[in-house]
């Protein structure tokens, strides 16, 4: 896994430095990696929406491992009739 990490890091370095070596500016290369419609407001909306969606599905004390969560106890479902 550590080797794969360094391979990705080296590929990113080549991907960023190759256009710079051809006379491009580093800031232009970095801005080229960012989508045109991505703004700080959209980033905050995405982060806020995902945080609230997670809390609606799972209570705060629930522990999930690798995105696998145990089933909710019956007392958490108020609409379930026994």
Swiss-Prot record:
UniProt key word Disulfide bond: yes
Positions bearing 4-hydroxyproline: 70-71, 73
Cystines in this chain: 64-69
Cleaved propeptide residues: 23-60, 74-82
Signal peptide limits: 1-22
Location(s), subcellular: Secreted
Tissue: Expressed by the venom duct.
Modified sites of kind D-tryptophan: 66
The protein's role, per its UniProt record: Moderately activates human somatostatin receptors (SSTR) with a preferential activation of SSTR1 and SSTR4. In vivo, does not cause behavioral changes in mice within a few minutes of intracranial injection, but causes a progressive loss of movement thereafter. Four to five hours after injection, mice recover, even with the highest dose tested. Shows antinociception and antihyperalgesia activities in two mouse models of acute pain, most probably by acting outside the central nervous system.
Family: Belongs to the conotoxin C superfamily. Consomatin family.
Miscellaneous section: This peptide is an evolutionarily optimized stable analog of somatostatin. In addition, it adopts nearly identical conformations as in the somatostatin drug analog Octreotide. As this drug, it contains a D-Trp at the same position, whose synthesis is a common strategy used for enhancing the metabolic stability of compounds in drug design. Consomatins evolved by gene duplication of a 'Somatostatin and related peptides (SSRP)' gene expressed in the snail neuroendocrine system.
Protein name: Consomatin Ar1
Organism: Conus arenatus (Sand-dusted cone)
